[in-house]
Every structure is written in C-alpha cells, then in structure tokens.
UniProtKB/Swiss-Prot annotation:
Name of the protein in its database record: Transcription factor bHLH30
GO molecular function term, any single one: protein dimerization activity
Hydrolase among keywords: no
UniProt region (Disordered), positions on chain: 333-368
Gene3D superfamilies: Helix-loop-helix DNA-binding domain
UniProt subcellular location: Nucleus
Keyword Nucleus: yes
Amino acid sequence: MCAKKEEEEEEEEDSSEAMNNIQNYQNDLFFHQLISHHHHHHHDPSQSETLGASGNVGSGFTIFSQDSVSPIWSLPPPTSIQPPFDQFPPPSSSPASFYGSFFNRSRAHHQGLQFGYEGFGGATSAAHHHHEQLRILSEALGPVVQAGSGPFGLQAELGKMTAQEIMDAKALAASKSHSEAERRRRERINNHLAKLRSILPNTTKTDKASLLAEVIQHVKELKRETSVISETNLVPTESDELTVAFTEEEETGDGRFVIKASLCCEDRSDLLPDMIKTLKAMRLKTLKAEITTVGGRVKNVLFVTGEESSGEEVEEEYCIGTIEEALKAVMEKSNVEESSSSGNAKRQRMSSHNTITIVEQQQQYNQR
C-alpha cells in the first residue's frame, strides 16, 4: 500500500510539473503574439489581426488594437488576416474553449491548476480519478502531452493490475498448486496399490477396497505363521531359561529313556566344553544337540540318555533333578564370567544357526 501511495504521489507531482510547463509555454506564446500584434499595428493601425493557437485562422483567440476590448472578455469573430511570422512552433489544434480558462490564472492556481474543457468543465470535483484527467489532457493537447506521457506514466498506469486482479491471480495460482499436489498424491497412492497387488501371491481383486481387505487378511496370516514359527524355532531370548523333561521325540531303540534339556543364556567360548564335562560326569550320552546363537545369546537344546539301563523310577528321580542342577551351575558360571568381563569390548553381534545331531547307530544298541 505504501509503494502504491508513493507511486500516486510521484504521478501527481509529474502531472503538476507538466501542467506548469504547458502554462509557461502558452504564456510565452501569448506574449509573443502580443509583441507581433504591436509590431504589426504600427504598420497598419486600422486593422486587427487574428492569431490561432496552431497558426490557423479562427482556431484560437483574436488580438485587437490597444483601443479594443481586453482579451479576457468575450471576443468578436476572428478576421482572415494572418500574422506575418511565427518564431515559435505552436501546439496542435485544441478545442476553442481550452484558452477560456487560461486567462483566469489566479483562480486556477488557487484551485490546484484546474482547467476547463468542453464536455468536462469545472463540475468535476478534485476527487475525480487522476487517470481520467490525464486522458483528457492527452486528447486535448495532442503532441504536447503525448511527448510527456512517459513521465506521466499514463501507459504504465493503464497496464497496471488492480488489487482485486492481483488477489484473483493469487487465488488462481493457489488453486493450480493445490490441483497439482492432489494429482501427485493420487499418483503415489496408485503406485503403492500396484506394489501391493504385485506382492500378493494370488489376487484377482482390481478395486482398491477389495485389494486392501485382501492385503490385511494376508498380513494377519503371516503374523499367525510367524507366531507359530517363533514357538518352534530355536531363537534365544533375552532372559535366561532352563527346562529339563522327558520326551518321546527321540527314541533309543532299546527302550531307554530320553531327556530333553533346553538351556538359554549368554554365549561364551567355554560354555560348550563345560556342558560336555557336566554330562560326562553324570554318565549321560548326547543323542542330539541343537545350538542357536543370536547377538551374543545362545540356546542349546540337548537330547540325552543314560549310558546304562536301570529302574525307571530311579532314572526319572536321578536324571531330572541332577541334570537340572548341573546345567544351572553351568549357567551361573556363565553369568559370573560375563559380569567380570563387562569392562571388555562387547562381542560383535552376529546371528548363526548351527545344529549338531548325534545319533548312535541301532547296531551299537543291539550289540549291548
């Protein structure tokens, strides 16, 4: 708003300056015509001369002798006498009433250089649009004002946009930007749906709602399968666990018992040798061993049996309690060594799955 106000003030100053220049030019022309008339009057005092603003007969105002009426009053019809010379180039032809207000310069200065025009007159208030005044000046004075139309900024003003037009342009740009963003969003959604359709194993759905429902059902099925796999898979947990129980998963062939021992603890280099020593001390033989390590944690699943057959009740009471206490001691030893070496650098986390299966041949059992 400030910039617009400054531009309007500059245009008003330029307009006032141009009007003053026009008045000065017309004033010089007026006095030049008076001098020319006086010079010609000494040669022919009985005649009067008519000078036009553009050098044409009857197109301007009439200059009379000294005994005639003052030019500020009503003027008689012009004669056909032409001036002998005209040193200054006159402006282009203008309406006859244009010079009527020129002689009343004192009032014009007090009213802010107000000019009178045919069809316009002094009825126009000072609040009238400045552009209309510039347009009338340009049409009335022709080349005089047209040459100064650059400083007036008339053409520039006509090319300027109004505040409402600027707001409309901004709204149009915002609407186009919103439409472009919406188009890109829909394109991304369609690309994601196409990827989901390609991931599903067997899909015949084409509409978006059915496709999303099928994807949700497939994700639920994958989650259920993952839960089942996690229960049966040998993945070590974050907490230490120890379970010892009889099992029928493995058979010796001669009717001997089989015990399944599951051990989950921190991994260390001497864990496996300690377990082997413990089992040998209890006179147990390993039939199968499954070992899984993930990120410094290890899970051992052992299937063991006794070396010699004995009573079933004695075996159950002896094996379950003894194996559980022995493996618990191995776990505690692992925890103590882990706490003592906590200041050392941590072992690099890595995942591996190793399965060791030790199965004795049936011929060895039969020989016994």
